[in-house]
Amino acid sequence: MKASLLNKLDVLSDRFEELTALLGDAEVISDQTRFRAYSREYAEVEPVVALYQQLIRVQGDLEGAQALLKDSDPDMREMAVEEVRETKQQLVELEAQLQRMLLPKDPNDGRNVFLEIRAGTGGDEAAIFSGDLFRMYSRYAERRGWRVEILSENEGEHGGYKEVIARVEGDSVYGKLKFESGAHRVQRVPETESQGRIHTSACTVAVLPEPDEQQAIEINPADLRVDTYRSSGAGGQHVNKTDSAIRITHLPSGIVVECQEERSQHKNRARAMSWLSAKLNDQQTSAAANAIASERKLLVGSGDRSERIRTYNFPQGRVTDHRVNLTLYSLDEVLAGGVDAVIEPLLAEYQADQLAALGE
């Protein structure tokens, strides 16, 4: 293992001892904010240090086995050869595990997200495909026990959505969906196509982590224009009686968000403000992410919304992710919510990129 990584592990071991002492300190215990912060850090550091201690023990075992290779007893030497082989293999596996654990954590991975799906080129077909994508993500969320809440929707004339915005809540939502941002292309024969010709349409997907209070950008109320209107969404007669829907325009950036699904104007406003904060955060961070990805020539993780990331070919039953040259002939399963078949190879590729950078 590289000296730089061993140095990191030594630093973490020292920090682990510090945290152990701090969590037993009466002054820290009485301060719940500090106690929770140290507890979270302890939970992150402890498994790494435990694995590092195991690595050190196995290294000691290897040294002992290597010493036995010089034993005068041939049977002992034979046993030592086998032990050296097994111990070296164990060390390789432990080092690989530790390298993965040392990869930089994305602080947003555990967050809820705002999912934005918009029809692009292709007119009615693009809107119908937006509906297909929204159902795909909704079914995936259902499989993972997440909750999907539509904030705003603009339905297509022949089904689907011209635009649909949802909030997805659950464990590690952003960590799973963060590489879904980009242009999704569909190739299929529309029902109205009498000649059987394949049409190509596209939709864009954006996945924005929902910021917490610490992350939320401070927004000057003077920079906002707030409009109320009557919701066109679900909600029965009540929707027609009150102007509960909210549209907020951030004047400096021109960003517009709206929420119309809640019956309470107060709830709609709170959701819209959270979404606006996510979009402003994304605006700040995406430029930096693109620069890093470009510098390291990364295909996964750039988050470029204009990048064509995936093609769904209905006649062939094929899904192709262009970033990792992945092709699957299981379109129906993917659209039914089996998105992990595409997501897991992307996460593996991203992790490989991180490991390469860690070793530089």
From Swiss-Prot:
Residues modified to N5-methylglutamine: Q237
Pfam families xref list: PCRF (PF03462), RF-1 (PF00472)
Gene3D superfamilies in alphabetical order: 3.30.160.20, 3.30.70.1660, 6.10.140.1950
Claim: Heme is one of the keywords in the record: no
Swiss-Prot/TrEMBL keywords: Cytoplasm, Methylation, Protein biosynthesis
Entry's Gene Ontology cellular component terms: cytoplasm
PROSITE patterns associated with the record: RF_PROK_I
Free-text description of this protein's post-translational modifications in UniProt: Methylated by PrmC. Methylation increases the termination efficiency of RF1.
GO molecular function: translation release factor activity, codon specific
Keyword Cytoplasm in annotation: yes
InterPro entries: PCRF (IPR005139), Pep_chain_release_fac_I (IPR000352), Pep_chain_release_fac_I_sf (IPR045853), Prokaryotic/Mito_RF (IPR050057), RF-1 (IPR004373)
Record-linked SUPFAM superfamilies: Release factor (SSF75620)
UniProt subcellular location: Cytoplasm
Protein origin, superkingdom: Bacteria
Role of this protein: Peptide chain release factor 1 directs the termination of translation in response to the peptide chain termination codons UAG and UAA.
Family note: Belongs to the prokaryotic/mitochondrial release factor family.
Name the UniProt record assigns to this protein: Peptide chain release factor 1
Organism: Pseudomonas savastanoi pv. phaseolicola (strain 1448A / Race 6)
